[in-house]
A protein has these predicted regions:
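Conserved beta-loop-beta connector loops within the AMP-binding
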Residues: 482-489
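C-terminal tail/sorting-segment detector
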Residues: 490-501
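Catalytic phosphate/nucleotide-handling subdomain of diverse soluble enzymes
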Residues: 213, 431-433
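Short, glycine-anchored, charge-dense loop/turn motifs used at functional sites
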Residues: 343, 478-481
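Residue-level detector of functionally pivotal "anchor" positions at catalytic/ligand-binding pockets or at interdomain
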Residues: 457-479
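Bacterial Sec-dependent N-terminal signal peptides
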Residues: 1-22, 244
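Hydrophobic alpha-helical bundle signature of multipass membrane enzymes
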Residues: 22-197, 218-224, 228, 234-415, ...
Length: 501
């Protein structure tokens, strides 16, 4: 069974291998020009006159309080901006001596390319915003062991360390799901290190996690990524002396948020004040078009996902026209529900409208929802999970898809059903879930079917019923579907011809 599983995955990799240029892609999974545009799908960094900046300041104080502790020592020694630090971190998590090109070439390749992919995901938004770091804004010295004054001229938003740490963690969690929660915990901590050292604000770190997840969604469209995951998995199994047929995928279900996410904010915490203020700040949007959108999208259903992401993808999603995409949406929704629902009773937190004696934008749901936990946000978990998967299905529309996925989570703050910190944690949970889903062969096959379906339904691609033969130009890849073009824009796929206008 194990051999069949790996063989089928290898076939999928081989089928989509053609067309990727090797020069730039030797060290990354996503070229610079193809990264999702974080300046579009994420909000601008909080200004110093904003309510969100209060949370940044509170967390800066928390970070400084950790410095003279073992947690602070960890943050300091993990400040290098090189793949070597991730080699150390992941070797510790995997309980092996080292990850190196010489001794573990497959693990090393997956690590280095994931590292650089995550790191590159923040370059453009850093240049766009040039946000001042805490050490600059507050006239502080650098504190991390390997941090330097270079940071003073490098943008704070988003956090590059967070992005390359979380990207690497997501890749390794997918590679060995049996250890996913331990791997993910270290990925979360690696981002928080930057708050402790004073190199970044909390909002920078939040954005870094999301940049990483978005770019790893794009990485999944590169056939080399799956090949490298499989090679690293086989190498690690051999390194640990595991028996033939050992399957780390079958030994892990959905990620357990209680093992890698922080505890929800308590009312005794200073950060609770920031949650309350952000609740009031979002409430003012209720009588605006943005508030109307939050109210209209309160429905948690397959139909709502079809509507929201169909609009973002520029197609009509329906069981008739896009059965594979509908099947994929239902699968992701069910897994997102499972992931969030199991965590809610474990990490129970009162919802804002209950805690503050308020009403919501959806009063008809208040009675049934008042006894349920605010942490995590099921809607946010669903929206961001779906966005990451649909961005893989339709990378041409990735920025709009990711933007809508982000907004779907923020809706819940406007509506009064969730706290801001719950929403941020839920996006981490979603990223972890998507990594786990990619370890399953049926999921990968469904994504490829959905991709093909999107191409057939997207504007500008129509069936051509002529007898023109394809030219002898090189074969190329349309995200998982081998295709051969001719000089007139004809694509031959599975015996059918399509005209790309």
């Amino acid at each position: 069974m194990k051999k069949n599983f790996l063989f089928l995955l290898a076939l999928l990799c081989t089928a989509v291998q053609v067309g990727w240029a090797q020069s730039e892609m030797d060290t990354v999974y996503v070229s610079k020009k193809d990264h999702p545009d974080a300046a579009y799908f994420l909000p601008e960094p909080p200004d110093t006159n904003s309510v969100a900046f209060i949370d940044d300041m509170i967390q800066w104080e928390w970070g400084k309080s950790q410095r003279n502790t073992p947690r602070g020592e960890q943050a300091s020694r993990e400040t290098p901006w090189l793949p070597e630090i991730m080699r150390t971190v992941m070797a510790e998590v995997l309980q092996i001596d080292t990850i190196s090109d010489e001794k573990t070439p497959a693990l090393s390749r997956l690590l280095v390319k994931s590292y650089h992919t995550g790191n590159q995901s923040t370059v453009a938004p850093k240049e766009t915003y040039s946000r001042k770091r805490p050490i600059v804004r507050l006239n502080e010295d650098t504190w991390g062991k390997y941090d330097s004054d270079f940071l003073r001229t490098n943008g704070s938003y988003p956090s590059g360390h967070t992005a390359f740490g979380w990207a690497t963690a997501l890749a390794f969690a997918e590679m060995w799901p049996e250890l996913q929660d331990t791997i993910l915990r270290r990925g979360v901590q690696f981002g928080e290190n930057r708050i402790i050292t004073g190199a970044h604000w909390q909002s920078d770190v939040n954005a870094g996690y999301l940049c990483a997840a978005a770019s790893m969604a794009k990485a999944h469209t590169n056939p080399d990524f799956l090949k490298d995951v499989l090679a690293a998995r086989a190498e690690y199994a051999k390194l640990k002396g595991l028996p033939a047929g050992y399957d780390p995928v079958s030994k892990a279900d959905v990620p357990h948020g209680e093992d890698f996410l922080n505890m929800p904010v308590d009312t005794a915490s200073y950060r609770y004040a920031a949650d309350v203020l952000q609740f009031w700040d979002a409430k003012r949007l209720r009588d605006t078009e943005r508030g109307k959108q939050a109210e209209e999208e309160a429905d948690y259903s397959v139909e709502m996902m079809q509507k929201v992401f169909g609009e973002a993808m520029g197609i009509n999603i329906s069981p008739v026209s896009t059965p594979a995409i509908c099947e994929l949406i239902e699968l992701v929704l069910n897994k997102a529900s499972e992931t969030a629902d199991r965590l809610k009773p474990i990490r129970f937190r009162k919802r804002p409208f209950v805690q503050l004696g308020e009403h919501t934008t959806v009063p008809e749901d208040e009675e049934k929802e008042k006894g349920k936990s605010s942490f995590p946000s099921g809607h946010t978990n669903l929206g961001w999970s779906m966005a990451l998967v649909m961005a893989e299905v339709a990378p041409e529309q990735q920025n709009e898809i990711l933007r809508r996925g982000y907004q779907y989570g923020y809706n819940r703050l406007i509506a009064g059903y969730h706290w801001a910190s719950d929403i941020e944690a839920s996006r981490l949970l979603a990223s972890a879930l998507v990594a786990r889903l990619h370890a399953d062969l049926p999921f990968l096959q469904l994504v490829y079917r959905a991709r093909y379906e999107f191409l057939l339904n997207a504007t500008g691609i129509t069936t051509v019923l002529d007898d023109q033969e394809p030219a002898s130009s090189p074969a190329f890849l349309l995200n998982g579907i081998p295709a051969t073009p001719d000089s007139h824009g004809i694509i031959i796929q599975n015996g059918q011809k399509f005209l790309v206008k």
